[in-house]
Amino acid sequence: MEYRNSLMWKELNEAPAVIADLAAKNACVMEKLAKEVKGKQIDNIYTAARGTSDHAMIYFKYLAETLLGLPVASGAPSVVTMYGAKMKFQNTLVVACSQSGKAADVMEIVRAANECGGVTVAITNDENSPLAKLAQFHLCCFAGEEKSVAATKTFSCQLYLALMLAEALRGGKVCPSLGEALKNAVAAIDAATDPVAKAFLPAEECFLLSRGVSSAIAFECGLKLQETCYIRARAYHSSDFYHGPMAMIGEGTKVILFASKNSLTPETDAVHREDSLKCAEKMTELGADLYIVTDDADAFAKTGAKIVCVPGADSEKLTVFFFALAVQMLACKVSCGKGLKPDSPRALKKVTITK
């Protein structure tokens, strides 16, 4: 299949237009939710999600902890569904994320939080889903039906709703022109991902690295390469990778590093860049076949890595949206180039329900 004929390609390209209208469509609910959270003196956040949705919650965790100073726990629904734990969700905002809104284990977390006085919000792509109805508040992706098994536009929408939520809780606003900026960047990202897609056609394994906000994209890239390309892809926070997994790097091992030009604040830009450079230099020193997805090509020009230069923004919290498109395009191209079907990977269904 030619990748441009796939549903995955069609749907990932719909994300910019959907994002452009997302803030207005969720503004009323977001205002009420922010008021409720402040009124109940919420002092911690708990997220419940699986797969791609959980990667969107990694993004939210970094935003909430850095911008709001609120600790965010990435929940393990099995604690409730398999062990029967009675969680104390008082003074807790529970954010449940599921594209279909049918995740049974995630719903059990919301039910438990509702029963003991927590504030619950669901992020789904279906206003009439069980999860949307169970939570006290619902933020909708409004992405339309997503037919490809691999989630693309819904992931971008989840990221945007996570950003909206973090900004609403601190009294800030989201970038109103992000959708238009993404639309204008599609052609450049398409061209930038061509060389790396060709290089990954024979790949059977690879590692995806990043640190901080962009880690969400590294983990999503790993999942996309696993499910659509059948590549044994493993994602790590680069700081964790040094503690053992780095021993797997040998001559020619494929590694993708995600590194944005700007951090969340100008004060941390230099530290962020230095950390990414350190990681890049270490990977090339070990002989890795390193690709760096970045909006800061000049900073990595001397690392010896292959640069995948994509457009970015003035903050890492926005640049991740451009990285997300790059990851989705890469996976779609590699899958089709391998003669696979990205829209219907083997052994998978569009809706996965775990309990």
Model regions and ranges:
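Tryptophan-centered motif/residue detector
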Residues: M1, I19, Y59-Y62
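Active-site phosphate/pyrophosphate-binding segments
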Residues: Y3-I42, F137-C141, E145-I256, K338-K355
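Alpha-helix N-cap/helix-start motif at coil-to-helix transitions, marked by capping-box chemistry
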Residues: K10-N13, S129, A324
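Glycine-rich phosphate-binding loops that contact phosphosugars or nucleotide phosphates
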Residues: E31, K38-K183, R211, G252, ...
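Peripheral docking tails and interdomain loops at the edges
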Residues: G312-K355
